[in-house]
């Protein structure tokens, strides 16, 4: 008998979002520096004897899930600060470029996996709100006979300010989601935002549910990347788009040597000084080196069923944005 699909904890911001979710067991998941937390099973449905890598260590697949979970549980409170310090703020530009590449239309339903502290989700909400407000202004200018009361009513309808767009943030790590919710409240994000505790390898959503699936700095921490990609394909609507922002392979030998020196000699030290956690940031650096190259990851996305798969390398290949469509 098949086990029920993963997790079931919903929390939400905004009126009108009360989706019924299926309950079940807590699974494990998480991402890396900059970005958002992702999947690796904490309580897998089937025990597997296969070995995998946790940074430079060789561990069982079952063990990796718990270790990755502990990493992001440990760094959650300092996650955003460390992202700025480690990347010198460049991670913000990379995420802005991801949104520019996405260019969501009004009414877009976005699933942000390993969304942790909300960087992609908040950018999405800002984008769709600004687009909708520009549309409103054009419409109001065309209706000069509206009273001031009617105009004010148009702008006070918070739910409508997003043009029907919604974002679901899915992460397995409760501490990361907690930080994200606190940021949302502090920055005034109330409508169009929902939070789900869930596993990227076994998403708690129906088929053909979302228009866009994003995952930023998370997929390399998934125990079974191929399974996470298949789940992304499953939950997207026909015509839906997969977008992944992830560390990649630097092709310039000189830049690669400098990048390695900085990654292994500086980042763990920053982790110890700022977050009091050397080991977690040592793992994050090691996990970057084990992630497939741009071309290899492109092939994995195609194997999951996506079409028109492309990628763009940023900052000499330190990161790359991969894109694919479900046809």
Swiss-Prot record:
Domain of life per record: Eukaryota
This protein's UniProt keywords: Membrane, Methyltransferase, Mitochondrion, Mitochondrion inner membrane, S-adenosyl-L-methionine, Transferase, Transit peptide, Ubiquinone biosynthesis
Pathway: Cofactor biosynthesis; ubiquinone biosynthesis
EC number(s) stated in the UniProt entry for this protein: 2.1.1.201
GO molecular function: 2-methoxy-6-polyprenyl-1,4-benzoquinol methyltransferase activity
Enzyme class: transferase
Sequence positions that bind S-adenosyl-L-methionine: 117, 171, 199-200
GO BP term (any one): ubiquinone biosynthetic process
GO CC list: extrinsic component of mitochondrial inner membrane
Stored NCBIfam families: MenG_MenH_UbiE, PRK00216.1-5
Family assignment from sequence similarity: Belongs to the class I-like SAM-binding methyltransferase superfamily. MenG/UbiE family.
Name of this chain's protein: 2-methoxy-6-polyprenyl-1,4-benzoquinol methylase, mitochondrial
Organism: Pongo abelii (Sumatran orangutan)
